[in-house]
Design a protein with these regions (language model features):
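Surface-exposed, low-hydrophobicity beta-strand/loop segments enriched in small/polar/acidic residues
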Residues: 2-151
Length: 151
């Protein structure tokens, strides 16, 4: 009988580094970054504006989609927000309505059986959100809980 590894051919005992299990697959330390944004009373972000979530992820970090979540208070009708990075503005969360209080799991990268863990950040990776549909409501609170592995 054949032995088939179900992680893209990676083996926990492989002799070459390219085929060894990575920390995000087994035994890695999950880290969390919680970032909160409160829109100002005037001069709120408008359609096309980009929110940059600070701090940046360290080089080589990988976001864990199903543990990363965006929370938001009630906002402007038609307002949407994405969560992405330099690779794609909606890498983690496609445009999502932030019109009523709620939350969204940032797992766009894992949709349709895609990559469970996204590729590593090539540099200090800035996580961004792009505003669409309508501007963000004055005093609206938006919080990003970002889970990542960096080992």
């Amino acid at each position: 009988m054949a032995t088939v590894y179900v992680n893209d051919g990676l083996s926990p005992t492989a002799a070459t580094p390219q085929n060894r299990v990575e920390s995000y697959d087994l035994g890695g330390k999950v880290r969390f970054a919680t970032m909160k944004y409160t829109a100002p009373a005037t001069g709120m972000p408008q359609i096309g504006d980009v929110l940059v979530w600070v701090p940046a992820l360290p080089k080589g970090a990988r976001v864990i989609p199903h543990l990363t979540k965006l929370y938001f208070a009630t906002g402007t009708a038609s307002s949407t927000l994405t969560v992405g990075d330099g690779a794609s503005a909606a890498r983690y969360l496609a445009a999502t309505a932030i019109t009523t209080a709620g939350s969204a799991v940032c797992e766009a990268a894992a949709a349709s059986g895609g990559a469970y863990i996204t590729g590593p950040a090539s540099g200090d990776q800035m996580i961004t959100s792009t505003v669409a549909g309508a501007g963000i409501k004055a005093s609206q609170v938006i919080t990003l809980h970002l889970a990542y592995v960096h080992d």
